[in-house]
């Protein structure tokens, strides 16, 4: 009987010791928000399909606005936009932005963005996802969340600061994306 009690006490202390050692040995990865582990500036080029430019279009409206205001509320756009290292649309793309955005405010222009930057260049291979609100009608510079990735950007997190550099009516725009990754593996 006493032998059985010793076994139970020993098992209990061993379990507590193992549990404590596993929690003590886990140290979360720290990162400095002042110094990103990767930083680069890219330019996204969006050419909207207007019924006549099927060969050049990189974005298409899938759901038309419902007429609930003057700010395209309810419009859903699918994209496959080239991303370059400079503002020139004819520059060689280093990535493609693939995904969608939709307008979600009646009182001002605001788009909710969900797209993945797909890299296939000599410098970077992999993807990361940008997902957040883009209040371009309210702010000249907007911070959007980078919420994960693959390849060279495996499980990365960071911020993409968007600045609209050029617009040509509703058919073309160029956005500067200042990418700062704070968690790199």
Curated annotation (Swiss-Prot):
Expressed in which tissues: Seed coat specific expression.
Subcellular location: Secreted, Extracellular space, Apoplast
Signal peptide: 1-25
Keyword Plastid among UniProt keywords: no
One Gene Ontology term from the biological process aspect of the record: phenylpropanoid biosynthetic process
A Pfam family the protein falls into: Dirigent
Disulfide bonds: 37-184
Role: Dirigent proteins impart stereoselectivity on the phenoxy radical-coupling reaction, yielding optically active lignans from two molecules of coniferyl alcohol in the biosynthesis of lignans, flavonolignans, and alkaloids and thus plays a central role in plant secondary metabolism. Required for seed accumulation of neolignans.
Subunit structure, as described in the record: Homodimer.
Protein name: Dirigent protein 12
Gene name of the encoded protein: DIR12
């Amino acid at each position: 009987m006493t032998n059985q009690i010793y076994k139970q006490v020993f098992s209990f202390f061993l379990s507590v010791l193992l549990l404590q050692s596993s929690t003590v040995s886990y140290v979360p990865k720290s990162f400095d928000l002042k110094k990103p582990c990767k930083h680069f500036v890219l330019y996204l080029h969006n050419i909207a399909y207007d019924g006549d430019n099927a060969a050049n279009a990189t974005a298409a409206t899938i759901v038309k606005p419902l007429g609930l205001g003057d700010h395209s509320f309810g419009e859903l756009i699918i994209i496959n936009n080239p991303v370059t290292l400079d503002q020139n649309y004819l520059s060689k793309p280093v990535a493609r932005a693939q995904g969608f955005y939709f307008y979600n405010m009646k009182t001002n222009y605001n788009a909710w963005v969900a797209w993945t930057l797909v890299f296939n260049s000599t410098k970077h291979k992999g993807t990361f996802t940008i997902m957040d609100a883009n209040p371009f009608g309210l702010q000249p510079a907007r911070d959007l969340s980078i919420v994960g990735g693959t390849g060279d950007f495996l499980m990365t997190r960071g911020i993409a600061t968007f600045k609209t550099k050029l617009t040509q009516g509703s058919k073309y725009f160029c956005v500067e994306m200042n990418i700062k990754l704070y968690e790199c593996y």
